[in-house]
Amino acid sequence: MAIQTSTKFSRVTLSYHPPVAHVSLQNPPLNVIDIAMMEEMAEALVEIEARPDVLVIVFAGSGKHFSAGVDIAAHTADKVEAMLAKFHAVIHLLVSSKKVSIAAVHGHCLGGGAELALVCDLVYTAESATWGFPEITLGCYPPVAVTALAGVGKYRAR
């Protein structure tokens, strides 16, 4: 079957080569996850989940990096609640998916980008990848998705 690419998104590229769906983060140069990207990722995950011909979801970043995390501009008092709700929706859709999810990590994988990768079923990471949670140095709460999964649960549960 030929590769099918969805053109309805601007912050992610969604393509299908059944049984695999590819979701590529598209916000160069660092693939910072802004609210618009969160909304598109959630919409893409709902679309993917509805397709019986897709068994695997592969997340990757375009260019040189997976993702440098969530947009710092979304961490303000007037935006953080909405941002967290949208990001948690993405995490929930991914964790509750019946599809196998894989993060293909290269370059920077920081903050929310690392959270996104870590909630996938498998993480394939380049030896040169840089992982971290720099939001802690800004006084932001440590990664919610990672603490919510609490190490033991997800990988033993599947």
Per-range role (PLM):
Residues 26-28, 78, 108, 136:
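Short strand-loop junctions, especially beta-strand C-caps/beta-turns
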Residues 31, 73-76, 132:
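Nucleotide phosphate-binding site architecture
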